[in-house]
Amino acid sequence: MDKNFYKNSLNIFNSNFSMKANLSEKDKFYADFWEKNQIYQQILRKRRGNPRFILHDGPPYANGDIHIGHALNKILKDIIVRYKTMAGFYSPFVPGWDTHGLPIENKIINQIGSKSTLEIRRKSNDFANSQILAQMAQFKKLNLLTDFKQIYQTNTPNYEAKQLKLFKKMVSRGLVYRALKPVYWSPSSQSALAEAEIEYLEYRSPSLFTSFDIKKGNNFVAENDKLIIWTTTPWTLIANSGVAVGENFDYVRIKNEENFYVLAANLLEKLAAIFDWKHYEIIDNFPGKSILGIKYLHPIFEKICPIVSGNHVSLDVGSGLVHLAPLFGEDDYWIGRENNLEMVMHVNDDGKFNENAGQFSGQFYANSNKLITEFLEKKSKILHLSFIDHSFPHDWRTLKPVIYRGTPQWFVSIEKIKKDLEKAIEEIEFPENWLKKRLTKMVVERKDWLISRQRSWGIPLIIFYDQNKEPVLDKPEIFDYIISLVEKFGSRIWYEKTTDELLPEKYQNLGWTKENDILDVWFDSGVSFFAANISDEKPPFDIYFEGSDQYRGWFNSSLINSVIYFGFSPYKKLLSHGFVVDAKGNKMSKSRGNGVDPLVILSKYGCDIFRLWVANSEYYNDIVYSEAIFEQNVEIYRKIRNTVRFLITNLADFKPKKYELTEVDLYIFNKIQKLKNEIIQNYDQNRFVRVVKIINNFIIEFSNFYLSIVKDILYADKKESLKRRQVQYNLYELLQVLNIAIAPIMPTTAEEIYSFIQKNNKQISVHMEEFFKESHFDEELVAKWDEFFQIKDSVYQLIEQKIKSKEIKRPNEVGVLLKTDSDFIKSIDLEKLLMVAKVEFSNEKTEILQLNWEKCPRCWNHFEKINKVCARCFEVLSEIVPEKNS
């Protein structure tokens, strides 16, 4: 008989499940399929009434295209939501957008110029809405399980009104107050900033040692003695109104050449080296409290200022005498208030000096350092000038330096709710304890929350001032009236109507005015737990999951707002991920020139491979993107797909039915049950990288062992043989497990696989299926197979030696004389399991036997020749062509 006859007699099937994925085409096909059949909506209807699981989406900013960090974040969330949904939970996912703030406002001002606030707001609102639509179209390409018709955004009247209800609650609890305080001020944004809006970057500052002349001395210091002062902000010397000393620190009066100087005793040696003093003399030694009240001449203007006590004075740097400019530093401010020091403000909103700066008026603050230094040099007041590179606060939007500047601002007291915040944090679940400490530090140790901003595009601070310019905070009916207007017309009403038109009738025509500031944008997004209206579900929600920068941002503001409004955290569990970095560990961004467009990646690789890269990343650290790493994930995908294709192809004639299994089939079945349990455990812990690794390792092990030994049964046994059906039963079990296991990570491929699976009660989509439950598996049975694998390794070492010496070509040519006294080993089909021609047992040693048997032309196994084919193939062929095989 010819080769084709034998080949055609084998159980070889074709499959429409292609080896090539063509993911870009299939992504669109299945996205349309899910939308057309309203799969998300069907899932929610099916799960309604079940235990709920809510992952609340932190809103990205509605400006520009999505970047790779956005894609990473949304995919991680989607994997969780898909898994929880398949695990039986009611898990609606409502995407949100953050719409107010400086980037949009600046963009509009650059387009239309300095128009009215109303025009800026109208254009900003239109722009934000257009950006939401653009980003939405891009997010859809990530195959997210959601309904983009059901979203939340911070610029809708309903959201804005709820935000203001929370603000009213803060006011009613006495947490909101107005104060003149130094705050972070951004000249580039011309607005106050909260700590959450500060980014620390490298910056070069002058390191200046100058001197102030004492006007009138006492028993320890004399007129014209020089106080040594150190500063890195010479521009603040204009606003100097005092010098602070440590009351209990030791100070010295020293003479160098013709001058007398005062400085901290502990810093004398260090400063003498810096100033190159060779022959100084210590005249006196005294505690700081001995010179309190001593007056000195201002370094620039003709006025007298005092020496006062300061708890913040340090002996780590400087001279032990600290120049005070009360409106340009927090410590300076409180010391200034306590000692009634003059509060000088010489810097305008744009960072330029006003008339209080005298001859320096009109200069930009940073440029004035050089001019002021030159001025002091002419007066022989410079002891030393150098420059230092150090970490310095910058505006996180413009990346320009910020300053501390005293302005009247609105604050929310954190001090009053610290115990409530600490209690709420104790109830939150963290994957690692250090993350709990991180949130605690950033929330509980923060200063009072600066909530006012001097901008146009945001939610107005709905506060009125009476005829005496005092804020009216004790009239809840006024807040209720405004909130009802905002709920109906949106926050624009605050700018469209006059003050009297915004007030209830009894408060009209009293000469009141309204506040012009807006609320911090972190206040906007930080009320989403309350304002987003997530399928009528109420907090606390199960998970908040954002980038690690949100500990100071959204996690922070959301917690504060929720504790104030509800008395508890808005989230039960907190997860965070790192930033996407390049192969060198640099954060990816367009500004650095190393950014990568996620849409380009999607177009090249398809969504499932992009999602696989996300799942296969240790997201709790920074995530490395490189072509090499992506190709590794392509290989993992290919391995999964090829395995699935093999399973589908070899199940073409299988009708799902339970079979009693052989020892080895039972072993594999139990391994599959163990696989299921490990997958569930790692999905439950949100360890997706472990899910991918477990699946990949199982496939490698399964292919190397089980598929190697059962291909012969699948292809060459009778189609209906029990052995073949037992193998197919395992293949079917694994196919179902893989299909469900990869569905949260690779929804397109999972849906495609599902279309090839035969089963009863099949759903319209794999994503409507239930995730498999944890299964019992026989640990003892699995463990006892370790003995077989030890024997297999030792036998194959001997076989490899034979192959290497070219005595044989393949393992199936040889016999094995096996030394063992194990009943288990003797009971299993070793010829199949070791893929050798023959196994016999020995009491002496294990060795390889060269048999010189014939190779069966049908199955290629080696056999003792009786017929043209081996006994098994003879039996199979006899049913096809009786009496023609002998």
Curated annotation (Swiss-Prot):
CDD domains associated with the record: Anticodon_Ia_Ile_BEm, IleRS_core
Q: Name one GO biological process term.
A: isoleucyl-tRNA aminoacylation
Per its UniProt record, the required cofactor names are:
Zn(2+)
Tell me the gene name. Answer: ileS
Question: Which species is listed as the source?
Answer: Mesomycoplasma hyopneumoniae (strain 7448) (Mycoplasma hyopneumoniae)
Annotated family: Belongs to the class-I aminoacyl-tRNA synthetase family. IleS type 1 subfamily.
UniProt catalytic activity: tRNA(Ile) + L-isoleucine + ATP = L-isoleucyl-tRNA(Ile) + AMP + diphosphate
Q: How does it assemble?
A: Monomer.
Q: Could you say which residues bind ATP here? A: K590
Q: What is this protein called?
A: Isoleucine--tRNA ligase
Q: Which GO terms describe its molecular function?
A: aminoacyl-tRNA deacylase activity; ATP binding; isoleucine-tRNA ligase activity; tRNA binding; zinc ion binding
For this UniProt entry, what's an example GO CC term? cytosol
In this entry, which stretches build a coiled coil? none
Q: Quick one: which residues bind Zn(2+)?
A: C856, C859, C870, C873
> Motif 'HIGH' region at which residues?
60-70
Question: Record's superkingdom?
Answer: Bacteria
Q: Look up the EC number in the record and give it.
A: 6.1.1.5
Transmembrane among keywords: no
Q: What is known of its domains?
A: IleRS has two distinct active sites: one for aminoacylation and one for editing. The misactivated valine is translocated from the active site to the editing site, which sterically excludes the correctly activated isoleucine. The single editing site contains two valyl binding pockets, one specific for each substrate (Val-AMP or Val-tRNA(Ile)).
Q: Name one Pfam family in it.
A: Anticodon_1
